Amino acid sequence: MGAFDKIKRRNLDYLLIETIKQIGVSNYSLLARMTGINPETVRYKVNKQLTKYGLGVQVNLNHAELGMSAGLMVVDAEPSQEWLGEVSYLFFEGKAIGASKYVGLYAVPFRFKKKYIDVMSFLKQQKRITDYAIYEAKWLRYPSFRPEFYDFDAKKWKVDWRRVEMTQGESGATTLDVNRDAEVDYMDVKILKAMQENPTVSIVKVAAEIGANPRTLRYHNAEHVVKGKLILNSNVRWRRPAIEGKPGELMQMLTLVKGVGQEGVVKTRKVMNKIPFTWLEGGSEVGDYFALLDVPMDKLYETTRYIESNTEDVRSSLSIIMLDSQKSRYLHIPEEMFDPKRGWTLPSYRQEMAKIGDGEERRHS
């Protein structure tokens, strides 16, 4: 392939990736119309070529429109303490390397927000965890894939840190915290879970899998999921280590600054948004900030040095936690917590917690 043909192909790849960010990958015809690429070529690129490039598509939910409050939890727990299976509504969980420390991203229905934190206190009281910290997110953002720093043919990042430093602004979809519940039904939850499991799935296929009328499901998708903006965006992610079964080539990193005020958050954000490996960031009302990165092992030293050298103003409040990529999990919308009649529910251990709490009150009355 000549140099001109390579440039032409690369421009088409860039265009397709930018369009996927806007509309997802489930509608090949719409992708074809918006990009001018032949529909069959679009189908091939989405189903085959992205994987060959070491990339994948992640569907991110709009927690605000789902009536959910999101945040970060950092938990200290010994291996002998059984607790992780007791915590629901997580959409990411990971374990620190070389420490009995765990991190989780959660999105819990607004009406359960206080009880959710009470659960963590209950687990600590029962000595099922050693300690915990909750950082409630006022906002979450999913930074966009940065194709200008990616070598598609070599399937790896090619980062010029001088160009990184010149990055201006930020890109990506943001969801804000809202103090309200949302009207979501069982069909909506089924559609969202199916799309998270397989971003290319068609509504007809989802209907067949759950035994629903395709017309009914199309209505729910159009009127609730799409118009209700229940999906925030579809983001292209670097997935080569997972695709090739080489988790040792990936280091996941949590960067956390605590209590630095809004000025400190803004300064830290500017640094983290320049780094092309950042895939999620969030901030609280009280000046906490966190970011999650998927860093190639051959870029770990450079990335850590870049963060440290550009965050001197918040150095005393900065923590960098390295996560074991083999023990990380991305979780879909918790369908099992949704009752078709009652909506979102509390898991059974909360009832156990309430009984113990009632007993304590009776003993002290």
What residue ranges belong to the model's regions?
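A compositional/biophysical signature of low hydrophobicity enriched in polar/charged and small residues
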Residues: 1-365
